[in-house]
Amino acid sequence: MTRHNNDLDWMLRAPELLALTRHMSTHELMSRMTVYNGFDYKKTHRLGVYFEQLWQHLTSQCNSLNIISHNLQVIIDKHTFGEFDSLIYDSVLDTHLHCELAVKFYLQVGSGTQLSHWVGPNLRDRFDNKHERLFEHQLALSKNPTIKPWLKAQDIKVDQVKVLTRGRLFYPLDSFMKEQFRFPREVNPQHLKGFWTTWEDFAHLQLSSSIEWYILPKMYWLSPVTGDEVQDLSLLDDRAILIHGHNERYEFQRIQQVVGMREGKEIMRGFVVTDEWLEKAKARVKSSD
């Protein structure tokens, strides 16, 4: 299978990131979907856009679903109110659906029990802010009194809203190794997990294990890496990190997602962060208090 097919399969089978009610979940919907060849990949460097492409392909191949619109912007009197990720008619349930999509990756910097203790790798994104926007704004678009007449004028119905959440939470290395996971009640207990650590501690992890480590480009952040794919990835040399760890020319002077491989199989993945990133992340979490 190609990476795209693996990612399509991952989208279908990976656990939800959030704990969703049956009413909100897309699980029943996706149980009718199948991975077919012919994915029309439009090159992008934005993982969220790629995630939308995967969803659009899966829904287009499902006979019981009719696509009304994807990425429909709501513009009223030159003001943009938001965007509907996916509007679909489900012929099995005779229901018009508004589906929102979210693929997110957060690192635990606080104690972990609050959404605000989790920050994105770029530091601009924080879990509590995303959660609030998703449920208070994006999923509520069709209920907005200003937008209701606009939808009617477009002859668009919304009977039910659903959300598809995928992604991974990254725990401090020690917690990850001991399987001591503390996460918010809004999170699905079966969510995908990874670790994070500093470059200095990561160098010691490399030396103490037989795992080969590779840098993961963003387009490899979804499905597990296969043995055939490692030839396309950059191998992290433990000696180079120890010798050149303070040289700004090297990859490891910024945050990177890495994957550990053994005998052609993915063992674990995580983020390796700089000291500067960690200080900024702590300040980002503290600002929520």
Question: Residue locations for each model-derived region?
Answer:
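Intrinsically disordered, low-complexity Ser/Thr/Pro/Gly-rich regulatory segments
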Residues: 1-289
